[in-house]
């Protein structure tokens, strides 16, 4: 998100509670991408995929969110590829063919799950460059004149009388001082890593 905002020249600020950008899953999923087309993969049955993801979630999901990923993840991949391949010369490794399917006998003896052709990764390029994907994004936004406020955690979301989010109160992990950041357009929260947050796990 920060890389996209930086590319568009938006006025934004990004905070990170850790001292450096964190690791991420080595591959990401995207449907019917340019990489999939180049590999000769058949188009995904999107209605069936929506049904499969909803089944896996026991129906406890917002299908609008799932549809957004199904319908827009290809554009996300094109954006990522434009940076990693266009700016850094990396090569996308796309998993397809027999490696991207369930064994045929699975449908005969077990539930016939739908597994979409979706895995994209840049692991070989990460290793060769000595830089992980998120580090490449950090380098990209810094080259465009932006920076990341590390060791800065979210303390509170601020709202106006109507309930609209107007900004945040952040707190420095170094000396504990508070920082008010006003947001004219909005606040984007990246809340991954649930297993590392005991309080959040208890709430769930």
Specify the residue positions occupied by each region the protein language model found.
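Core beta-strand elements of the Rossmann-like FAD/NAD(P) dinucleotide-binding domain
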Residues: 175-186
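Second-shell loop/turn segments in exported
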Residues: 36-39, 54-68, 123-124
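Conserved N-terminal glycine-rich FAD pyrophosphate-binding loop of Rossmann-like flavoproteins
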Residues: 17-42
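Flavin (primarily FAD) binding-site architecture
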Residues: 189-204
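N-terminal Rossmann-like FAD-binding beta1-loop-alpha1 element of flavoenzymes
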Residues: 1-14
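Conserved redox-cofactor binding core of oxidoreductases
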Residues: 70-177, 198-199
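Hydrophobic/aromatic ligand-binding patch that stacks against planar heteroaromatic rings
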Residues: 4, 21, 187
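Residue-level detector of anion-binding/catalytic polar loops
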Residues: 11-12, 20, 147
